[in-house]
């Protein structure tokens, strides 16, 4: 007779990890394929390198940012245009720091 497992495994951790992986995949796709090259150059690498380290609350902030129009969003990132208070978040600060430390340095070298 076959033993029946009366103690089903708790796979909620696996499901949460899978859901997070899928969420990050959607964020990365949307960040790299914006249709506005300058925004792609900042948000694509940011989503690859930094987004996996963000908390769920920070990912919420990032998703709100990438829902915005490219021209507005890029203007806020480079601080050309005033950023509305609801988008002046810790994630926006991280995006700006990433741009200065990584993207601007590469562009300065002639890449991009």
Predicted regions and their residues:
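Positively charged, polar, low-complexity stretches
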Residues: 2-59, 63-112
